[in-house]
Design a protein with these regions (language model features):
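Residues that mark the junctions of alpha-helical repeat units in TPR/alpha-solenoid scaffolds
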Residues: 73-74, 106, 110-113
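Aromatic- and histidine-enriched alpha-helix N-cap/loop-to-helix transition segments
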Residues: 88, 112-116
């Protein structure tokens, strides 16, 4: 069976990006049940494995995240990013944080960039690519350290920095600040 790899297969990348964007859209409150809508469209168009399984698994994982956020009434993009991290959805966290990073400036921009890079480091690590993961983790630590005050929504930022230095696997769970 073909392996799903968004880094080398166009269809995999398109599906991952569409589903991730749907999750971000739903988290930003722009459209309810959008993950189900987008997943359904892809399932109608894609008949082969591993795409179908990936779409179904993503739909289930995203549903769990959305239920978790709703049941606990977690508000705000930054807090949603913490939840995505804790669910191991590093690519999706990166996508969500980019929605506020693009409009930020100065040290806040550096801080958000550091978190985006930290998520990217774990995307690479989980893909079995330790060299790019280490490089990205190094840049993440640098950006986070110079702007820590903008990341007060993370209660264990020092632990995250330590784990990025060691590139700990599994990554630490983030605490809400």
């Amino acid at each position: 069976m073909k392996r799903l790899d968004p880094f080398s297969d166009r269809m995999s990348r398109d599906i991952r990006n569409a589903l991730s964007s749907a999750l971000v859209t739903e988290l930003c409150g722009e459209q309810d049940r959008y993950v189900d809508t987008v997943a359904g469209r892809w399932l109608d168009d894609v008949g082969e494995e591993p795409y179908r399984s990936y779409i179904e698994q993503s739909r289930v994982r995203y549903g769990r995240v959305l239920d978790h956020i709703r049941k606990r009434q977690i508000r705000g993009t930054r807090n949603h990013a913490v939840v995505l991290w804790n669910f191991g959805l590093f690519f999706e966290m990166h996508e969500l944080l980019e929605t506020i990073w693009l409009g930020s400036s100065g040290k806040e921009r550096d801080a958000l960039k550091g978190l985006i890079q930290a998520a990217g480091a774990y995307v690479h690590l989980l893909r079995g690519k330790p060299v790019p993961a280490r490089k990205l983790a190094h840049r993440a630590r640098k950006n986070i350290r110079k702007a820590k005050e903008y990341l007060s929504f993370i209660g264990n930022l020092d632990q995250l920095l330590h784990c990025l230095e060691q590139l700990a696997d599994p990554p630490p769970k983030l605490l809400h600040g």
